[in-house]
A protein has these predicted regions:
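PRPP-associated nucleotide enzymes
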Residues: 1-342
Length: 342
């Protein structure tokens, strides 16, 4: 009887394991904040699901009001919100959305933040400077985020500001694809880093394309103001492709483009993951001699493209959608570091 009981227990536990194994993973729900609804819609279209119902509004005193319009109990929730536009309002909205889902018993809440806010404030560059990127990381965790998906962090060490998993996706595979398909003379190209901080990213792209790379070294005096620039590398009669993770007022890349043409480059392109384009950026690009300024849609670009015909956009919704699908199914995301999903 004793052996029989053991045998029954063994069989019974394997039956239970079998049942647990067959039981479906919790369903996925994707919600969009108000910063970039267009990108969120593209992501869910690729996943073949609907956007979750949510009402986002402001009270008359300008406090953010969030109403999640459907049950998220036991669900795997993804909230898409980029750090652009009204950055502080959008960040607050994201924190409240995360918290609303968390206290409504979502099994896991992932913040999908294509362009991470405050990413440039990642170190003390002068006395008494705040490290705001770390503060944002703390706020996301306290709000209840279990996981972060972002793209081309300004400094990849920001991943270490979190105690939760962070997937820092790369636009690089999509950028390589764009270069090969849209710059006929790319084999005669040279990939240029507009500053030393970007050199690692740029050498990786140059290696993948099997072309040379150049570097522009700049000395800054004040924030958002560029001073002297020194070009290291031979660009004469070559197609120069400037690559950077973000451009804000575009002083650096426009200055760099002039420097490259002075040095004899035949054409100049700029490829940027996050096109913030604030202040005088658009007029600077219009006046600079770029063949094209190529950005991804981690930030809404429709208005910028209307104002500036040189701006072109690479859609990265398929990368974010595939990252969500793989995360939901418990698959590895590292495939996306070197491939563009179809």
């Amino acid at each position: 009887g004793w052996e029989g009981a053991l045998c029954y227990a063994a069989n019974h536990s394997s039956d239970e394991q079998e049942l647990a194994f067959r039981r479906k993973m919790p369903n996925v729900k994707v919600f969009s904040g108000s910063s970039h609804c267009d990108l969120a819609q593209k992501v869910v279209d690729r996943l073949g699901i609907e956007l979750g119902k949510v009402v986002l509004k402001k009270f008359s005193n300008q406090e953010t009001c969030v109403e999640i319009g459907e049950s998220v109990r036991g669900e795997d929730v993804y909230i898409i919100q980029s750090g652009c536009g009204e950055v502080n309002d959008n960040l607050m909205e994201l924190l409240i959305m995360i918290n609303a889902c968390k206290i409504a018993s979502a099994s896991r809440v992932t913040a999908v933040i294509p362009c991470f806010p405050y990413a440039r404030q990642d170190k003390k560059d002068k006395s008494r400077a705040p490290i705001s990127a770390k503060l944002v990381a703390n706020m996301l965790s306290v709000a209840g985020a279990d996981h972060i998906i972002t793209m081309d962090l300004h400094a990849s060490q920001i991943q270490g500001f979190f105690d939760i998993p962070v997937d820092n996706l790369y636009a690089e595979p999509a950028v390589l694809k764009w270069i090969r398909e849209n710059i006929p003379e790319w084999r005669n190209g040279i990939i240029v880093s507009p500053d030393a901080g970007c050199a690692k990213r740029v050498t990786a792209i140059a290696d993948r394309l099997n072309v040379e790379f150049a570097l522009i070294h700049k000395e800054r005096k004040k924030a958002n103001e560029v001073d002297s620039m020194v070009l290291v590398g031979e660009v004469k009669d070559r197609v120069a492709i400037l690559v950077d993770d973000m451009a804000d007022t575009c002083g650096t890349i426009c200055h760099a483009a002039g420097k490259l043409l002075e040095a004899g480059a035949s054409k100049v392109y700029a490829i940027l993951t996050h096109g913030i384009f604030s202040g005088p950026a658009i007029s600077r690009i219009n006046n600079a001699c770029f063949e094209a300024v190529v950005v991804t849609n981690t930030i809404p670009q429709d208005q910028h493209m209307k104002e500036c015909p040189k701006i072109q956009c690479i859609d990265v919704s398929m990368i974010l959608a595939e990252a969500i699908r793989r995360t939901h199914n418990g698959e590895s995301v590292s495939y996306l570091f070197s491939h563009v999903p179809m």
